[in-house]
Amino acid sequence: MAIYSILIHPDPRLRLPAQPVTHFDDALAEIVQNMYETMYHFHGIGLAAPQVNIQQRLIVMDVPQRSAEEGEKAEQIPSDKLVLVNPEIVQRSEECQDYEEGCLSLPNQYALVTRPANITVRYQDITGATQERAAQGLLSVCIQHEIDHLNGGLFIDHLSRLKRERLEKKLAKSLKNTKKS
């Protein structure tokens, strides 16, 4: 197993659209395992292949589920570990939700992003079998966020120009200070 390097914005490779996966073999399984290792190493809940300079339509996720009962403290329950190959959103709700998003490619930068609250995603699993799944809450946000990466997008693309530029300046300053250390 290997831990990949994460591409950091404004690396232009993050803006390249990924190509469909066509081979469902041991090499793909190894990439998936390495992506999980990388995601866990950097404390992420989702990782798209383009973030590790693999230009394929491939996502790994391990999204914590929480109890939806109101008035109670959200209880941690088993996570939703998913591999999505060649995913596409086939249905979006009109209802939207705001969620504070972060990204391994924009370290320590967060912003409130509005996205459809509920989606249905069609994808292939690691064997190439077509699957379809409904998602809501954090899982819905994570799927949409990672699919943005496959299309050459970032969560900051959903922000106003002013908020995006402010966040990019904070990131540049943070990276500059990290290099000095």
UniProtKB/Swiss-Prot annotation:
Keywords: Hydrolase, Iron, Metal-binding, Protein biosynthesis. InterPro entries: Peptide_deformylase, Peptide_deformylase_sf. GO terms for biological process: co-translational protein modification; translation. The lineage of its organism: Bacteria, Pseudomonadati, Pseudomonadota, Gammaproteobacteria, Cardiobacteriales. The keyword Protein biosynthesis applies. Its EC number is 3.5.1.88. The gene is def. Its cofactor is Fe(2+). GO terms for molecular function: metal ion binding; peptide deformylase activity. Belongs to the polypeptide deformylase family. It is an enzyme of class 3 (hydrolase). Fe cation binds at C103, H145, H149. The active site is at E146. It comes from the Bacteria. Removes the formyl group from the N-terminal Met of newly synthesized proteins. Requires at least a dipeptide for an efficient rate of reaction. N-terminal L-methionine is a prerequisite for activity but the enzyme has broad specificity at other positions. It holds the Pfam family Pep_deformylase. Binds 1 Fe(2+) ion. Gene3D superfamilies: Peptide deformylase. It catalyses: N-terminal N-formyl-L-methionyl-[peptide] + H2O = N-terminal L-methionyl-[peptide] + formate. NCBIfam families: pept_deformyl, PRK00150.1-3. This is Peptide deformylase. It comes from Dichelobacter nodosus (strain VCS1703A).
